[in-house]
Amino acid sequence: MTEVRVRFCPSPTGTPHVGLIRTALFNWAYARHTGGTFVFRIEDTDAARDSEESYHAILDALRWLGLTWDEGPEVGGPYGPYRQSQRRELYLDVVRRLLEAGEAYESFSTPEEVEARHRAAGRDPKLGYDNYDRDLTPEAIEAYRAAGRPAVVRLRMPDEDLTWTDLVRGETTFKAGTVPDFALTRGNGDPLYTLVNPVDDASMKITHVLRGEDLLSSTPRQLALYAALRRIGVADFTPEFGHLPFVMGQGNKKLSKRDPESNLFAHRDRGFIPEGLLNYLALLGWSLADDRDVFSMSEMVAAFDISKVNSNPARFDQKKADALNAEHIRLLEPGDFAHRLRQFLTEHGHIGADVDEKVFAAAAELVQTRIVVLGDAWDLLRFLFAPADEFTVDEAAAAKNLGADAVPVLEAAIAALEPLPGWATPVIEDALKTALIDDLGLKPRKAFAPVRVAVTGSHISPPLYESLELLGRELTLARLRSGLEWARQ
């Protein structure tokens, strides 16, 4: 079997979106599964829309997710350069060879002339190009040139059905005549995507083209161009094609770049970890097993088969994505989780380098099973790490839990904790249970809610006794006294 070579070739426009990264993931997984090569190529031929900022955002996204490429920008490879903007001379040479071989021709018709011919023949004026210039005489061509009329170069489409066996959708046919001769260049001679994409695939020996369903309709054009490229010696073979299902958003509409959940970095900013997001993106068209949604990337690579990709549209379900991310957070080794959480909270400006490493690791362990995304952790840990002058008590929690009936509870808690010889979780737990449950006869919720709110500022926190140990005796007692003052008002 020929070594599998797949490619991911985004245009550097805008912010990376989940559909784009799903395509990268499936190509990467197929390359790793087969022991093949994952080629990363940048399609930056649209100077008006392309940006270096977007280019670097794509690099950032792939690196964050661990989707490493074998050939491409910043890595190199035998078929470079890997940016289309640096390959212009190659494309122009291919255009010249196609023209010389009669595979392509110059077309001078304007859109207005094409529409007029359709109307005159009683056809829909929006049908598109009508192949009129295929058989222009040399005299007509010279007359157009003498008049200074620009020409696009068009490929001669075959007068026969175009059929291929799609790796996802099975046998697919476009009837003869349904795809007109299409432009390979602009009127100014600049090569178009319709030319450069297959030429790059051919020159980089791409064996499998795995891409979104939105590009399905361009496949007949690419097949016809490949046939011409093989006849002129540019291509050695025609790759296999597989079209991945649409990703749908709310209301069963195709997920748009404008939909917030489509923005890859919005998920990262919330605190998704790569394992969780990749696991969910893998499920947008593929599954490891019917009864198993949670899996690692190594498990995906071992099992990934492009023929098992579902052709039906996949719906982006934020709740399911969140749930999978929570599962992957729980699966992290505690030290790894603490490192990632610390990095996240530091990058978001919540904590600084002065936070004690052991204290942070212990705090992280308390919240690892209680969060969905890393961003959830700050609300739970703010009471420990926010500067003292920024500590506040949630007003709704205080109104409910720091009323007059909290006075005896907080007085008893202070009296129980003040004289403790040591400050460790078991000692704190024993002292509070004795003072509040045994001596005051309170139910646990009534006993501990005022303590929790006074000390953490919220009715939701990590486990109480462990939290008090980490906060320390001095701060714990100070906050209990402040809570007592509040309750007495």
From Swiss-Prot:
Single Gene Ontology BP annotation: glutamyl-tRNA aminoacylation
Subcellular location, principal: cytoplasm
Motif mapping: 'KMSKS' region: 254-258
Chain sites annotated for binding ATP: K257
Organism superkingdom: Bacteria
A GO cellular component annotation in the UniProt record: cytosol
Enzyme class: ligase
Location in or out of the cell: Cytoplasm
Alphabetical UniProt keywords: Aminoacyl-tRNA synthetase, ATP-binding, Cytoplasm, Ligase, Nucleotide-binding, Protein biosynthesis
InterPro entries noted in UniProt: aa-tRNA-synth_I_cd-bd, aa-tRNA-synth_I_codon-bd_sub2, aa_tRNA-synth_I_cd-bd_sf, Glu-tRNA-ligase_bac/mito, Glu-tRNA-synth_I_codon-bd_sub1, Glu/Gln-tRNA-synth, Glu/Gln-tRNA-synth_Ib_cat-dom, Glu_tRNA_lig_a-bdl
The reaction(s) this protein catalyses: tRNA(Glu) + L-glutamate + ATP = L-glutamyl-tRNA(Glu) + AMP + diphosphate
Xref: HAMAP family: Glu_tRNA_synth_type1
Subunit structure: Monomer.
Family membership noted in the UniProt record: Belongs to the class-I aminoacyl-tRNA synthetase family. Glutamate--tRNA ligase type 1 subfamily.
Function: Catalyzes the attachment of glutamate to tRNA(Glu) in a two-step reaction: glutamate is first activated by ATP to form Glu-AMP and then transferred to the acceptor end of tRNA(Glu).
NCBIfam families: gltX_bact
Name under which the protein is recorded: Glutamate--tRNA ligase
Lineage of the species this protein comes from: Bacteria, Bacillati, Actinomycetota, Actinomycetes, Mycobacteriales
Name of encoding gene: gltX
